[in-house]
UniProtKB/Swiss-Prot annotation:
Reaction catalysis annotation: a plastoquinone + NADH + (n+1) H(+)(in) = a plastoquinol + NAD(+) + n H(+)(out); a plastoquinone + NADPH + (n+1) H(+)(in) = a plastoquinol + NADP(+) + n H(+)(out)
Function: NDH shuttles electrons from NAD(P)H:plastoquinone, via FMN and iron-sulfur (Fe-S) centers, to quinones in the photosynthetic chain and possibly in a chloroplast respiratory chain. The immediate electron acceptor for the enzyme in this species is believed to be plastoquinone. Couples the redox reaction to proton translocation, and thus conserves the redox energy in a proton gradient.
Keywords, comma-separated and alphabetical: Chloroplast, Membrane, NAD, NADP, Plastid, Plastoquinone, Quinone, Thylakoid, Translocase, Transport
One function term, GO molecular function aspect: quinone binding
The organism's place on the tree of life at top rank: Eukaryota
Topology of the protein relative to the lipid bilayer: Peripheral membrane protein
GO cellular component: chloroplast thylakoid membrane
Matches recorded under NCBIfam families: PRK12494.1
Protein encoded by which gene: ndhJ
NAD as UniProt keyword: yes
Protein name: NAD(P)H-quinone oxidoreductase subunit J, chloroplastic
Family affiliation: Belongs to the complex I 30 kDa subunit family.
One Pfam assignment: Complex1_30kDa
Amino acid sequence: MQGRSSAWLVKHELVHRSLGFDYQGIETLQIKPEDWYSIAVISYVYGYNYLRSQCAYDVAPGGLLASVYHLTRIQYGVDQPEEVCIKVFVPRSNPRIPSVFWIWKSADFQERESYDMLGISYDNHPRMKRILMPESWVGWPLRKDYIAPNFYELQDAH
């Protein structure tokens, strides 16, 4: 079954893949990394002016990484928002996605957290650096293949 967002993208010949609907009835779409920035701009112009959240996860050990965006469009009032979930999958060997910071400023800390925890680099982000872990930290702690160090320095406890 195709939702409103998917139908709109098909109408405008924008490449995507529908992943169905979640338990709340929100449509989930898969977008290729190279198409993401264009579709993000078009989504903003279409009315998705609120980035509710951005997160990322490791799909499987040695597999793909995913960056997830929850967009909201409020057209007919606050009590009737239209929502869509966008997933962008990237290989862990080259985890690069265009940043949407310049479209939705709320992506700032969220993209940085995804970088810090999973190593997904968001191209053209103005401050792409660690936000939770020390700059000297080696590796990406939320990757399923991450090997945790078996020692911690006293300075890391502060």
